[in-house]
Amino acid sequence: MRKTLMAGLAAALCIGLAGSASAQQADSRLYRVTKAGVLRMCMWPLYYSISMRDPKTGELVGIDADLSKELARDMGVKLEVVETSFGTFIADLQANKCEIGMFGVGATMKRAQAVEFSHPYLVTNVYAVLRDGGPIKDWADIDKKGVNVAVTLGSYIEPFMRGYLKNATLTPVAPPATSQAELMSRRADIIMTDFPSALRMTKEFEGTKFLLPPEKLAVTPYAYVVPQGDQVWLNYVNLWVDTIKLDGRLAAAAARHGLGPIVAQ
């Protein structure tokens, strides 16, 4: 009798778990995206080598511009780009404006309180970019009174620099303005940024160079970002990131856009 009762309870539990798993899958963004045939992807269109809109063609160019198309193709759906920024992407995800953010988002502990991150695909740290002939000669010149340091508003570098700088003035720059423009117009003495943005400055703006700190600062993984509470969707995105690492698509896309040195292993 006891064995019969336990067997019955186990069977009921299995049925309940199966039903719960089935309901979870049906409610997942993975199911909804494949059913609708459209993947809405949040992207900041001002990120060099990551997701930069070409002013001549209007097309998005960069590693995530390429890889977002790969994800949509692997899912068998169309890609719909939803423009966002570092200051608004969390609210956009929470408001269900997109299923995923793909634009070099730094996976920080603070952001992880509001969204979930995939396995990392890039890893970078803080770089300083300055003008030749400016007041900054080496790293020790940065944190001094009278020095204006520009950062992108909402970037992971902004809160780090707030804690790091003791004497210099920190100026967060909100889109559509850019920290690069602040530097070149001499409103800023130096900008704090990541590898992709430092790469852009030294390639596109004559008379600029970047400085590395004596030791790496704010080493941060870049990952894809999804809303909280959808483990099925997050599992799929994680598997996809692992897949493009193994099949070479991540390395190839990074190499096309000069990001080979910061590919996550």
Regions found by a protein language model. Give the residues of each.
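Extended ligand-binding regions for polar small-molecule ligands
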Residues: 66-74, 140, 152-155, 221-261
